[in-house]
Amino acid sequence: MNLKVKIGELTLKNPVMPASGTFGFGLEFKDIFDLKNLGALVVKTITKNPRLGNRPPRVYEVSCGMINSIGLANPGWDYFCEKILPQIKDLNDILILNIAGESVEEFQYLAREAQRFDEIKALELNVSCPNVSKGGIAFGTDLEALKQIVSSVRKIYSKTLIVKLTPNVTDITVYAKAAENAGADALTLINTFTGMVIDVKSKKPILGNKHGGVSGPAIRPMAVKMVYDCFKAVSIPIIGVGGIDSKEAALEFFLAGATAIQVGSQNFVEPGFMPRLIRELGEYLQEENIESIAKLTGLAHRGEENV
């Protein structure tokens, strides 16, 4: 049975990859399972300059998920390409670099730098992180800013360009179409929902940054609907993400319209979940006598023309 999928110019051996920010740079997981078995390796967000991130506490468990306010803590581009990239370039054949900037110029700088490295096969633009006061949420919810970022990076970057969208908007299909028209090769849907938790004893917000991004199974129904809606709105591949913790959860995303999927919070719960999921998806195709995982994409839309 065929698990291969195509994202932009890339052919992935299977549709399963980690969500940026939940898998580090892969180094913490390489002794748990062979990362070459993944469809791709998506690393945590890199910015031009080092970021210390938000003040702690940064992570808190909630019902059916978690809320985090990491604040894009990372060592910056120079350290990444000099110290980290040499360590991870052979972990998987398809390395996807997630980048964020505090200005259009910073996105352009990172795209120009990434273009120089053959090891980096694709970029995923983080225009949707809800934890940072500059960039992130502002870009992801400002339609004109989104268009400007994607189009400016597209002019510089010739390899596969993926845009990760925020769900914290009124109609995500408008942003999906804007990203496609600006030059995106694929979309990642979705990032986290903005949320807050309060300690009733201290009567203060628990997170150091007060608010953060909610992820995990609690957001899956909303994520599936957004993939479903965007599948009808755009013609480029969608990478579905949001609360995938089982084979059935993954299948929901494919049926809604996803070509590939990312696993986030579940990596903390079960570090070996992704290789198990890949195996179970293959078994599912065999049991259902489906020749290719690509055949599942968008099947939930069948018959809509008659509704």
UniProtKB/Swiss-Prot annotation:
Localization per record: Cytoplasm
Keyword Electron transport: no
Cofactor binding note of this UniProt entry: Binds 1 FMN per subunit.
InterPro entries according to UniProt: Aldolase_TIM (IPR013785), DHO_dehydrogenase (IPR050074), DHOD_1B (IPR033888), Dihydroorotate_DH_1 (IPR024920), Dihydroorotate_DH_1_2 (IPR012135), Dihydroorotate_DH_cat (IPR005720), Dihydroorotate_DH_CS (IPR001295), Dihydroorotate_DH_I (IPR049622)
One function term, GO molecular function aspect: dihydroorotate dehydrogenase (NAD+) activity
Residues that hold FMN according to the record: S20, K44, T45, N98, N126, K164, I190, G216, G242, G243, G264, S265
Alphabetical list of PROSITE patterns matching this protein: DHODEHASE_1, DHODEHASE_2
CDD domains documented for this protein: DHOD_1B_like
Annotated substrate binding sites: K44, N68, S69, I70, G71, L72, N126, N191, T192
Class of enzymatic activity (EC top level): oxidoreductase
Keyword set, alphabetical order: Cytoplasm, Flavoprotein, FMN, NAD, Oxidoreductase, Pyrimidine biosynthesis
Pathway membership: Pyrimidine metabolism; UMP biosynthesis via de novo pathway; orotate from (S)-dihydroorotate (NAD(+) route): step 1/1
This enzyme's EC code(s): 1.3.1.14
Taxonomic superkingdom: Bacteria
Active site: C129 (nucleophile)
A cellular-component GO term for this protein: cytoplasm
Gene Ontology biological-process entries: 'de novo' pyrimidine nucleobase biosynthetic process; 'de novo' UMP biosynthetic process
Chemical reaction(s) catalysed: (S)-dihydroorotate + NAD(+) = orotate + NADH + H(+)
Cofactor(s), names only, from the UniProt record: FMN
Known role: Catalyzes the conversion of dihydroorotate to orotate with NAD(+) as electron acceptor.
Family: Belongs to the dihydroorotate dehydrogenase family. Type 1 subfamily.
Subunit structure: Heterotetramer of 2 PyrK and 2 PyrD type B subunits.
Record's protein name: Dihydroorotate dehydrogenase B (NAD(+)), catalytic subunit
Source organism: Carboxydothermus hydrogenoformans (strain ATCC BAA-161 / DSM 6008 / Z-2901)
